[in-house]
From Swiss-Prot:
Location within or outside the cell: Secreted; Bacterial flagellum
Secreted recorded as keyword: yes
Record has Lipid biosynthesis as a keyword: no
Subunit structure: Homopentamer.
UniProt keyword list: Bacterial flagellum, Coiled coil, Secreted
Entry function: Required for the morphogenesis and for the elongation of the flagellar filament by facilitating polymerization of the flagellin monomers at the tip of growing filament. Forms a capping structure, which prevents flagellin subunits (transported through the central channel of the flagellum) from leaking out without polymerization at the distal end.
Gene that encodes it: fliD
Protein name: Flagellar hook-associated protein 2
GO BP term, pick one: cell adhesion
Length: 642
């Protein structure tokens, strides 16, 4: 606050000036404000250095977490006998069983492809003389698609109608081949590969009674396209779910076919060149005919890299810890966090866990060189990790990989101590009462029941595929029952009879919110991936769908699991480092508040002091003026008397 300029304490004494007040204020600020400023700067520096340490600590924690996670040991790599342009490729997910396989591809899956005869104009009419309409029916994958044309329908319109009716399952296009005179052709291509995707034709459609009726106008349209139907075969479209082929084989330019290959000598057939049902987490892609061997191996590269990341992160952390906690006895200088127990204990806590010895289940060789199960004591020194004189870690990757290869199971147990898996507990959707009545034999007579074709319903567990289309004696399985509960129980019994170790199926009753029915429940020990595959419609009737459940290991207390917990005690919400950081923040906030209030008090005091002395000086100036007036009067009187 400004009150004017205070020059001196009246009468020219010069005792109290503004400069004197400023010096008094500066001295008090130095005594009372500077300690706050210094402490705030010290805490801010501590917090900055602590933030750097926390960042390094979190990087180290990330490296530890990856080694505490058992999935790092489940990583796999595939080594193929042919690397350039192989006949097949294999990819696998983590956890797939280590194995070798021989694949011999003898035939690739193909789509079905037809082309019409040459057309002069892509916008020409299919049949300009057509009276009324004509119905053309196409079949593929057991489904039928009927399109209706009239005299105004062009070839492009026909292609669009086929695409729309089939929902893209049959792809129709008008292509320009460049042929003279008739450069355009209508082509049909099945969306998917495989024999079941084969396209067939019927000149007509199904009537209101469900009977197929021929249409001579449709026959003419097919003939005009070059697709005259070969009706010599005995075909029942309703029963066979397919129509006729064409007479002109030259216009059937590619025939739908399944892929054929052998897996370790076993003949296999698939509708696609991408095979995903050989085992959970495995995808085989067929590229061309030929033979190739695959070896699924443990991927040590990922574990080795994780170890090196751990070492690098720790050494980076130690560099920051040394700078922040160092003390030089000769110079007396010390790091900003020297003497802070929460920080000083970081290194010792980490090393205590990291180099702790632990007894785990492992193997050893007996006198005859045979491996026998036993308890073994391990430490990180056994895996190539050591602490050098500088206090940093060193890592011998070759020693590490050799030790892991010797006994991967004991390594996994030592690192993360995974001893069990989450149980599998999968329950299907509700099968509402009455939804399976068409398969029942309620009167004790014959019944069609529900038959599964190969691949309609399969279960994959412990890397084995179980096809439910067959009984244990190899005969075809038919699902029957007098009641829906009995029918479903027969299904559960059939699955359980497969002897799938670790997996059980049961039927559960359901009665909630006025909905009654049953559900199928699958339970297991969770040590293997579990999947259900098959025909979507059949599975849906049974309250199921394609599903893949990956086994989930439960984390134990191996070396890195324990170290992970220790680090969490430092960096977690209630961790020691977190709490210390919060205390610094609170201290800085409190110090700033005290500093501001003290500064305000000092400012008020010296503003008041300056104001008071200005008032004193004003009074003294008035008195001085009065004194001068009296003095002048006296002097004037004296002069007049003289």
């Amino acid at each position: 606050m400004a009150f004017g300029s205070l020059s001196s304490l009246g009468f020219g004494s010069g005792v109290l000036t503004q400069d004197t007040i400023d010096k008094l204020k500066e001295a008090e600020q130095k005594a009372r404000i500077d300690p706050y400023t210094k402490k705030i700067e010290e805490n801010t520096t501590k917090q900055k250095d602590l933030t750097e340490i926390k960042t390094k600590l979190l990087s180290f924690q990330t490296a530890v977490s990856s080694l505490a996670d058992a999935t790092v040991f489940a990583k796999r790599k595939v080594v193929g006998s042919i690397s350039d342009n192989p006949p097949a490729s294999l990819t696998v997910n983590s956890g797939v069983a280590l194995q070798s396989m021989n694949i011999n591809v003898t035939q690739l899956a193909q789509k079905d492809v037809y082309q019409s005869k040459g057309l002069a104009n892509d916008g020409g009419f299919v049949n300009a003389q057509l009276n009324g309409t004509a119905d053309l029916t196409f079949f593929s994958n057991g489904k039928e698609y009927t399109v209706t044309v009239d005299k105004n329908t062009t070839y492009r319109d026909l292609a669009d109608k086929i695409n729309e009716a089939s929902g893209g399952e049959i792809v129709a296009k008008i292509v320009n081949t460049g042929e003279k005179g008739t450069p355009y052709r209508l082509t049909l291509t099945s969306k998917e590969t495989g024999e079941d995707s084969a396209i067939s034709f019927y000149a007509g459609k199904k009537d209101s009674n469900g009977k197929y009726q021929k249409d001579i106008n449709a026959e003419k349209i097919f003939d005009d396209l070059g697709w005259g139907l070969d009706v010599s075969a005995s075909i029942d479209p309703d029963k066979d779910k397919k129509g006729y082929g064409i007479k002109d084989a030259s216009l059937h330019i590619q025939t739908a076919q399944n892929a054929e290959f052998t897996l370790d000598g076993i003949k296999m057939f698939r509708s696609s060149n991408t095979v995903t049902d050989l085992g959970v987490g495995m995808t085989l892609t067929l590229n061309k005919t030929g033979e190739i061997n695959f070896d699924v191996q443990q991927d040590f590269e990922g574990v080795t890299k994780a170890m090196q990341d751990l070492v690098d992160a720790y050494n980076d952390l130690v560099t920051n810890l040394n700078a922040a906690t160092d003390y030089n006895s000769e110079t007396g200088t010390k790091g900003t966090l020297q003497g802070i127990s929460e920080v000083n204990s970081i290194r010792s806590s980490i090393l205590a866990d990291l180099f702790d010895s632990q007894v785990v289940d492992g193997t050893t060789e007996d006198a005859n060189g045979n491996k026998v199960n036993t308890k073994v004591m391990l430490s990180m020194q056994d895996f190539g990790l050591s602490l050098n004189d500088a206090g940093t870690l060193s890592f011998d990757s070759s020693k590490f990989e050799q030790k892991v290869k010797e006994d991967p199971d004991s390594t996994e147990s030592f690192f993360s101590n995974i001893t069990k898996y989450e149980d599998i507990n999968h329950t299907g959707e509700v099968i509402k009462t009455g939804s399976l009545s068409k398969y029942l034999n309620s009167n004790g007579g014959n019944t069609n029941g529900l038959e599964f074709k190969p691949g309609d319903f399969t279960i994959v567990f412990n890397n084995q595929t179980y096809d439910l289309s067959k009984n244990s004696d190899g005969t075809n399985f038919k699902l029957t029952g007098k009641t829906e509960e009995e029918l479903l129980q027969n299904l559960a019994n059939h699955i359980n009879s497969k002897g799938i170790e670790g997996l059980k199926v049961k039927v559960e009753s359901y009665n909630q919110n006025n909905v009654t029915g049953f559900r199928l429940n699958f339970s297991g020990d969770g040590s293997s991936d579990f999947s259900i595959k098959g025909d979507a419609n059949i599975l849906k009737e049974l309250g199921l769908s394609d599903v893949n459940i990956t086994s989930k290991p439960i984390e134990g207390k191996g070396i890195f699991s324990k170290l992970k917990a220790t680090l969490q005690e430092m960096t977690g919400k209630d961790g020691s480092i977190t709490k210390y950081d919060e205390s610094l923040t609170n201290d800085i906030k409190s110090l700033n508040t005290s500093k501001d209030s003290t500064q305000a008090m000092i400012d008020t005091r010296y503003d008041t002091m300056a104001n008071q002395w200005l008032q004193y000086e004003s009074i003294l100036n008035k008195l001085n003026q009065q004194l001068n007036t009296v003095t002048n009067m006296i002097n004037a009187a004296n002069n007049s008397n003289n």
